A protein has these predicted regions:
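N-terminal plastid-targeting presequences
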Residues: 63, 78-107, 891-960
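Left-handed beta-helix
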Residues: 94-303, 483-903, 909, 932-933
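N-terminal chloroplast transit peptides
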Residues: 1-64
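Domain-scale recognition of functional cores that engage charged ligands
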Residues: 273-312, 320-605
């Protein structure tokens, strides 16, 4: 979160010293020396560092940008209407909740709120000295035990000699300490033994509780462990009720050092007036400039691929998606959602494999990108994800290619003085939730993930969330990593337009200062949508009458510089717990009491990656592109379209009803397919079948889905696929990488599947790229006509690829099999199953295109294919393709066909479609071995490569 928010906690530099890390002695002294009045009873006159509006009469800075700067990080292009920077509201003084006017229920609610406010204030005053003492105790368990045992509540609890107190001497020292912590923070109700006072029963229940709490104690060590977690959560709750700004962030962070080399963050005095202004962040825009800059930036990313890693936060459960285990009824992880015929996690890994295939085809090397995955203990998430990956043989990437680490669950805290929610079903159990995806950075440090990636010589990584299947589209990921790695950036955000009223966070450029040295801090950051108003960000349109919001959307698609993120963790307290908040929007008990858990935001580690101006100066907008953080803009549907929740079928179809649902996400996938087909020159109907109602009720206007390895860059795809037409409700699925499509017309369903689209595997079921051993298909001047999908069939669901087909044209290529069709019309329900080592050619007989003749032959004994695509990185970052083919292909086939008609060649009998089963494959005559390949260049249709790469970089288009 932004620096002025109480939710930002800075991490002391002790993180580098040990794992798990603890707060430094200096930071612990600062915390313990704070008076009890700072939190819960602060004087209205107490100055607040990091709060905006403290300069009387100051005018907000205007985000005036220089449109003439055209470097790779050129400032944003603004609308003609001047945009002023948003300034955070002044810090609120403690407010005694007044009794609201109104009816009896409102009066009662106001009274209850006032009581909650007083409970919170009293509890904070009680906990502060205990939290401070815990920080002074450091990491030594004996020292912490001594502090906790001296707490009056704990002493009274032990003296009472209840069932729990009696078994503590027989428990481990750490477990006994954690139980005492529960008592010290006022949660004795959790320890009630309702079923039995039997010591064995009580001990077992306590051990189960402690198994969870020890992870909370370890993860929040820098805040004071379990005590610090409770205190920080209660501070934020109290602030939301009108209490003073939470002080934890300032107390921990005042002495932090900047993650930037050579930049020292000096201590800010308590009276230094500090303001926080938020601007629309500038950045290059992949949507503009004819695609030249997008192509160039993507080529940078392609070159940097051997230095990249992938990071996936997969902690979310699929509750809102309605995903359940059919046997147990338990919620399944969102990663297991069957989206377009495969799980979401498989979709992300297919995108990654496609980028690796492009690198292999371009540079001849098989790069194996390491994948780090953050799971959660919630509802068996970790176990299910681990099991899925193993069942899928690690998706052909090998066990050493993955590193899974588990996010801890944290207690839910209510507004009633911070009381935990006690489970009614399980003895000594509390409601637990994941603590937000911001935990990912500290976990990567504590569990050695950064070390693992460093050993693999990785310098950067792209971060994607599991519920967003769209981020791998075209140039997005390549360009983001390319810009980040080439410019040695610390962090980058892929951003896009945000619709007014959308429930999503925004990206901002924060200008904060001055500090004690007179410097201003700058950096791109994120503001969660739940706190937009708190930061003075209203939902204004970018221009009058526009439906696009002024600030761009945060998409959770990130680039990170691994070393810089590590340094931020080790030198800035904000890195460990970025963007802390407690969301109180929902009730957490049966009687409607609200509460939440302490959460952190993954993106807000950017707040620990700031750049600084010179003392006494502000950094001019023309230099904002030099900051360690950046934004890269693209079209929304090229970056994000999430599948987070199930569509409400009781409501009429609308864009709002489809938002964040699998139905809506798949519609965006088809919009992208429509754009791609336009680029390829393939005519097609409207993607939604006419409108949203038609899409929901009758299905999409067409379906076009392809293995991303066909590209994944659209420039590459457009050289393989050119011309043709998809008729209304046509379905095309190309699960193949090596293919050539020229003027293909489809009415119905066309399914082409290669069982080895990228080559083979080794004995350990690990993918081995080999473009001489993959299946390949050519369709030239081919017409496909059949009845296709039965859209009225029960259970039809386009987004999950749950379809019933009346008829289809299906081609299956096993191993290195080849399928070659030219000038034919394939009608009705036809299936071709080509074995490995075989080649099937289809050509027109005497009766015309519908008179389809088959010719089967063996592939060359030396293993060479009859044709293949050659890739090369050309001018301006264009990946250029050339088709190399052996001489004896279609032309030789035509000659043989003519000879057969004249009775001059003795060959195996020809077969026509429908006359031979796919199970019966005539061997035919072996073709002569190729003496070489004939090269034929591909093209990209309407898109041309830039004349000069430097010119493209200088003309880098910008947004906003």
């Amino acid at each position: 979160m932004l620096p002025s928010m109480a939710a930002t906690v800075r991490q002391p530099s002790a993180l580098a010293a040990r794992a798990p890390p603890f707060a430094s002695a200096r930071d612990r002294r600062r915390l313990s020396q704070r008076s009890a009045t700072t939190s819960g009873a602060a004087s209205p006159a107490t100055p607040r560092v990091g709060r905006a509006g403290s300069v009387a009469g100051s005018q907000p800075a205007r985000a005036v940008l220089d449109p003439r700067d055209r470097r790779g990080y050129a400032p944003a292009r603004l609308s003609s209407r001047p945009l002023r920077a948003v300034r955070e509201p002044a810090s609120a003084t403690p407010v005694e909740p007044s009794e609201p006017a109104g009816d009896a229920s409102a009066k009662h609610e106001g009274q209850a709120r006032g009581e909650d406010f007083e409970l919170q204030r009293a509890e904070l005053a009680r906990l502060r000295p205990l939290r401070d003492a815990m920080l002074r105790a450091g990491s030594d368990l004996a020292s912490k035990e001594k502090v906790i045992a001296s707490d009056p509540r704990v002493a009274a609890f032990l003296d009472a000699r209840g069932p729990v107190a009696r078994v503590l001497p027989n428990m481990g020292s750490e477990e006994a300490y954690l139980v005492k912590c529960v008592v010290a923070i006022g949660q004795e109700a959790v320890l009630d033994s309702r079923a039995s006072d039997d010591p064995i029963h009580v001990s077992n229940a306590l051990r189960a509780l402690c198994a969870t709490l020890k992870h909370v104690e370890a993860f929040y060590d820098m805040l004071g462990g379990l005590v610090g977690y409770q205190f920080a959560a209660l501070e934020l709750i109290h602030e939301a009720f009108g209490g003073p700004p939470a002080a934890t962030s300032r107390d921990l962070g005042a002495d932090a050092k900047s993650a930037l080399a050579g930049s020292q963050t000096q201590t800010v005095s308590e009276t230094t007036p500090v303001t926080v202004d938020m601007h629309v962040p500038p950045g290059p825009d992949l949507r503009e400039g004819g695609g030249e800059y997008a192509r160039l930036a993507a080529s940078w990313g392609l070159r940097e691929l051997p230095k990249m890693a992938e990071v996936y936060p997969l902690g979310g459960a699929g509750d809102r998606l309605g995903l359940e285990d059919p046997k147990t009824g338990e919620s399944l992880p969102a990663a297991l959602l069957n989206y377009n015929g495969r799980t979401l996690i498989e979709g992300l890994l297919r995108d990654l494999t496609a980028r690796e295939w492009l690198y292999y085809k371009t540079f001849g090397e098989h790069v194996k990108t390491p994948v780090a995955i953050m799971t959660s203990a919630a509802k068996g998430n970790h176990a299910r994800i681990s099991s899925l990956i193993r069942e899928k043989d690690f998706f052909g990437r090998g066990e050493s290619g993955f590193r899974l680490f588990e996010q801890p669950l944290v207690p839910v805290v209510t507004v009633r003085g911070g009381a935990w929610v006690v489970s009614e079903e399980k003895e000594m159990s509390v409601a637990l939730k994941p603590g937000g995806h911001g935990a990912i950075w500290k976990l990567m440090h504590d569990q050695g993930v950064f070390t693992w990636l460093g050993a693999k010589k990785r310098v950067g990584a792209t971060v994607r969330q599991i519920t967003n299947p769209m981020a791998g589209t075209d140039t997005t990921i390549f360009a983001l990593s390319g810009v980040g790695a080439r410019e040695n950036k610390a962090m980058g955000f892929a951003s896009c337009e945000r619709h007014l009223g959308a429930a999503e966070g925004v990206n901002v450029l924060v200008e904060r200062g001055p500090d004690a040295a007179g410097r201003y801090a700058y950096g791109v950051s994120n503001v969660e949508y739940t706190v937009l108003q708190r930061h003075g960000i209203s939902d204004e349109p970018v221009a009058p009458g526009s439906s696009e919001a002024r600030f761009p959307a945060n998409t959770n698609v990130l680039y990170i510089g691994l070393e810089k993120i590590q340094k931020a963790l080790e030198s800035s307290p904000r890195g460990a717990f970025p963007g802390m908040l407690v969301n109180l929007s929902k009730p957490v008990t049966k009687d409607g009491v609200k509460g939440g858990r302490l959460e952190t935001s993954m993106q807000n580690i950017a707040d620990a990656l700031e750049g600084f101006s010179k003392p006494g100066e502000r950094l001019p907008p023309s230099r904002w592109g030099e900051l360690p953080t950046f934004v890269l803009y693209s079209s929304r549907r090229r970056i994000t379209s999430s599948a987070k929740k199930k569509r409400d079928v009781s409501k009429p179809p609308s864009s709002q009803n489809l938002a964040q649902t699998p139905d809506g996400s798949f519609l965006d996938l088809l919009r992208n397919a429509s754009d791609l087909l336009d680029k390829c020159g393939v005519a097609h109907p409207k993607h939604d079948g006419g409108d949203t109602n038609a899409y929901v009720d009758y299905g999409p206007g067409f379906i076009f889905c392809a293995d991303p390895a066909i590209g994944p860059l659209w420039d590459v795809t457009a050289q393989k696929i050119r011309g043709g037409k998809l008729h209304d409700r046509a379905e095309v699925r190309l699960e193949i990488a090596e293919t050539q499509w020229r003027d293909v017309e489809v009415s119905g369903s066309l399914l082409v599947t290669a069982t080895a689209p990228l080559g083979g595997t080794n004995g350990q079921k690990v993918n081995v790229f080999d473009d001489t051993k993959c299946g390949r298909a050519r369709l030239l001047d081919v017409t496909v006509r059949n009845k296709g999908v039965d859209w009225s069939a029960k259970g039809t669901q386009a987004w999950s690829a749950t379809l019933t087909r009346k008829e289809c044209c299906e081609v299956t290529l096993r191993g290195n099999a080849e399928f070659d069709a030219r000038g034919v019309k394939l009608e009705g329900d036809v299936k071709y199953d080509v074995p490995a080592g075989k080649r099937l050619e289809l050509f027109a007989g005497p009766g015309g295109p519908a008179d389809v003749i088959e010719r089967w032959s063996d592939l060359a004994s030396d293993g060479k294919p009859s044709w293949q695509w050659r890739y090369a990185l050309g001018e301006g970052g264009m990946v250029e393709l050339e088709l190399e083919e052996a001489p004896a292909t279609h032309s030789a086939t035509k000659e043989r066909a003519s000879a057969r008609r004249d009775g001059k060649e003795n060959v195996a009998p020809e077969s026509r479609v429908g006359e031979s089963s796919a199970r019966e494959k005539p061997t035919g005559a072996k073709p002569s071995r190729s003496n070489g390949f004939v090269t034929r260049k591909g093209s990209v249709g309407k898109t041309a490569a830039p004349v000069n790469a430097k010119a493209a970089e200088k003309r880098a288009p910008t947004s906003r």
